[in-house]
Amino acid sequence: MERGSLLKAKAGGKLHGGNHGIAPEEVVAAQRARMSVGMIEAAAQKGYAAVTVADVLERAGVSRMTFYQHFANKEACFLAAYDMAVEIVMTRIGAALAAESPALERIDGALDAYFSTLAQEPEVAKVFLVEVYAAGTAVLQRRLATQAGFVDAFAGALGASLPDQRVVAEAVIGAVVALATNRIVAGDFGALPGLREPLMSALITKLVRQDPAGS
């Protein structure tokens, strides 16, 4: 996959003045998508705190009036951008977890999807795991909900339904996120896919210790 191709696909083509036969709701959706992509690009390059509405307008190719028709402020735009980043990452993870295969193979596929997507989409990765912490309470609450969903999916794949088992799933996902975040902050995106194998080895070892019969 081309580096950054999923984000580019979200941006779509540049809209021009006039109707051109495009339904109004499609124009609205396209404008919102372009501004969300513009925010992801700006926040990844400059850091959320330094981003201005003008930065988003320049990248999205829309007017200031259009921006405020969609978003009350910069934080609201970042929230939409974060949701787009979540969709890009979690869609591939969800597909892996939904596969018709044994639990550990699904977990392996989900980790591969997670790390490879972050490596291929560096701007998305920065917004998803780094700049989210600078964007205010509403975005942080959304981030917590996203991670809780990831924990639920992981626990469900392993059949971990008891409270103690969920805590273990939460610890595993916390470690995955921390490892990825450290590499992203360091700018070492190439190291991300290599995290999957040692994590899977550790997980398998833990499961074998819990179930010596390997059932």
Residue map of PLM features:
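N-terminal intrinsically disordered/low-complexity leader segments
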Residues: 1-30, 158, 211-215
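Amphipathic alpha-helical packing segments from all-alpha helical-bundle domains
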Residues: 136-171, 178, 193-201
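Alpha-helical structural segments
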Residues: 30-41, 45, 59, 76-96, ...
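Amphipathic alpha-helical segments used for helix-helix packing
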Residues: 118-137, 181
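Secondary-structure edge/capping motif, primarily at the C-terminal ends of alpha-helices
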Residues: 93-96, 100, 128-132, 183-187
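Helix-turn-helix
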Residues: 42-76
